[in-house]
Amino acid sequence: MHKKLKAWGGATGLFVVALGVTIIALPMRQKNSHGTMIIDGTVTQIFSTYQGNLSNVWLTQTDPQGNVVKSWTTRYQTLPDPSSQKLNLIPDYSQSNASRDYNVLSIYQLGKGCFLAFPYKLLTAEKMLVFLSKRFLGSYHEPPR
């Protein structure tokens, strides 16, 4: 009886470990994206993972020479915009490391694995033009005023 109980306990333990590993591995199956945002002349690399309606967003702001000026991680609630390939991200302020520098981020999907993210209040047509022309035309010309 003791041996049967021990064998059953061992099998149960193995099952629990396997279940735990599966549960831990499940969040790894997230959609990863990389992109660049340009705000006031500074380039910011963005790396984010989406899972359900929550997003973890890692941002690294660099100067034109590529030196890191600031980097942070925060968690956002993802609000998809069904009319476009856009996600509005609202910071989850229950996270102690939530950055209030970026109240709302809008992420635009420009292609497979390519995203453009802007703080909502800073998003302007001119900045979109700067990004898109640099991205797809290779250069940027100041628009006529």
UniProtKB/Swiss-Prot annotation:
Effect of residue 122 to Q: In strain: Z17561
Effect ascribed to mutating residue 95 to E: In strain: Z17561
Function summary: Involved in TCP pilus biogenesis.
Protein known as: Toxin coregulated pilus biosynthesis protein H
Organism: Vibrio cholerae serotype O1 (strain ATCC 39315 / El Tor Inaba N16961)
